[in-house]
Amino acid sequence: MVVGASRRARRVVRRQSGKGIVYSAIDVKKWAEKIPTAAQVRPACCSRCGAASRPLGGVVVLVGHGLRERQVRGPAGPRGQPETRVIVVRRYRCERCGGLTTVLPRGLTARRHYSASAIGLALCLHGMQGLSIGETRQRVCTWPVGFETERWTTLISWLAAVAEGRLFPCVRPSPTQASQRRQAERAAATLCSLALATDELEAQAFEGAALAA
């Protein structure tokens, strides 16, 4: 899959998630500070047909196809305030099959507004730190909290996605009878185990979720 790709390309683009989406090794924070060039994050191959993006001695097959805005919700750090940011992601078009490939920075999740790190933080706060759903919502949710502070269906939908393997597939399914808090605890513990950070659990979950997305 990396025939003709440079070492840099192999290092920068790490894996795919669904049709047409590829994740970069560059995290959201660094990406937002300086948008990488088309060459820096060009995938090794087309996400649709598998054609090498730069065949050895040949012309570029996967060419830049412009930029696209992408909304990112949630705290920018484990102790940050919830916010909504807009970043620009890169798109590429395959000259062979015409397919489009979008490259996202590490830490985003396909077809979700909240970053993987924000989701991981929420799972940690509720499952491992013992915060209520309302308290977790205040730490992560970007929308103003109304009267129903203990209701947050978004967190429940994340737990369902984890259970079905659609989100953080590295997390093993919880027992059928497990409570939502126990499900969140299992998921958060798995994410923490992936992190390089050795400080507080919230930082571990934040980093581990970005790596697991």
Where are these regions (language model features)?
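Short, conserved DNA-binding cores of transcription-related domains
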Residues: 1-107
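Long C-terminal interaction/binding lobes of large macromolecular proteins
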Residues: 2-44, 51, 155, 159-213
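Residue-level marker of positions within ordered structural domains that often coincide
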Residues: 51, 99, 127, 141, ...
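Short, conserved catalytic/metal-binding motifs centered on acidic residues
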Residues: 94, 122, 136
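Short, Lys/Arg-enriched anionic-surface-contact patches
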Residues: 102-118
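Short, amphipathic alpha-helical "recognition" segments used to contact nucleic acids or chromatin
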Residues: 115-130
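A generic secondary-structure signal for well-formed alpha-helical elements
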Residues: 126, 144, 163-166
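Short, basic interhelical loop/turn and adjoining N-cap
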Residues: 130-157
